Amino acid sequence: MWKDLILEIKDILESVNYKLNTPATDTEVQRLREHAKEKLNVDLPSEYVEFLKTVNSLDFDGLVLYGVDSFLLETEKGEQICGFIEMNEIWYENEFQKEYLFFGDSNIAWFCKNLSEGTYHELDKPSGTVMNTYDDFKTMLEEALKITLL
């Protein structure tokens, strides 16, 4: 389902002469996994890895989904990428946010995983109040994309 939404976004972008970012390679994803483990002490969800292998970061209509950081890429692609490691390090400057792993944000929300509960949340930005809870990354991703396409 989320892949269909990505295709819809792709069509919209192409209609105004923009493109989706290219997919991350296996090597790039592996580098991200290693850095996430080393710097953030987390394993990446398989659904997030699948997203990265479809499109490495997405910036569309106020929704930004993080990708493999530029310093982990095999080659410079000239694409706008909000890096997963970089963005989590920024959000972790606020102590209460260290309980979350951030995958993206919008003008009004963060999309993240509660590390102690294992649940996925849409948090109000900037208060951090839970607006929605999801059982898995895939469902959270689909809802974020649907909202953006409204």
Per-segment meaning from a language model:
Residues 114-117:
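Short acidic-glycine loop/turn motifs at beta-strand connectors
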Residues 126-128:
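Short, solvent-exposed aromatic-acidic interface loops
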Residues 1-110:
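A surface-exposed partner-binding patch
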Residues 119-124:
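Intrinsically disordered, low-complexity regulatory segments enriched in Ser/Thr/Pro
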Residues 130-143, 148:
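Compact, glycine/acidic-enriched structural inserts
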Residues 110-112, 130:
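Short, well-ordered, mixed-charge alpha-helical segments that flank or form enzyme active sites
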